[in-house]
Regions:
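A short, Lys/Arg-rich alpha-helix, primarily the initiator
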Residues: 1-17
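Short, basic-rich loop-to-helix N-cap that marks the start of a DNA-contacting helix
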Residues: 41-54
Length: 71
């Protein structure tokens, strides 16, 4: 099942800080395809979420903006 809120949240947050999919993928050590799938609402592993959180340098209170009670 596609989680539309997650799809919109990661993409919106990424765009709000003016970072491309390619740049986020590079910083997180992931492929652009992985970022694209997550932005489209596909589930991802906890390790992948951790990489994105670290790459975006999120504070603990900001994590819910992207992964909503999922981490």
């Amino acid at each position: 099942m596609v989680q539309k809120s997650q799809m919109n949240s990661l993409k919106s947050y990424r765009e709000s800080i003016f970072i491309s999919k390619a740049e986020l993928a590079r910083k997180a050590g992931l492929s652009v395809g992985t970022i694209d799938r997550i932005e489209k609402g596909k589930r991802c592993r906890l390790e992948t979420k951790k990489k994105i959180i670290l790459a975006l340098d999120l504070e603990p209170y900001e994590i819910g903006k992207i992964f909503e009670n999922d981490v």
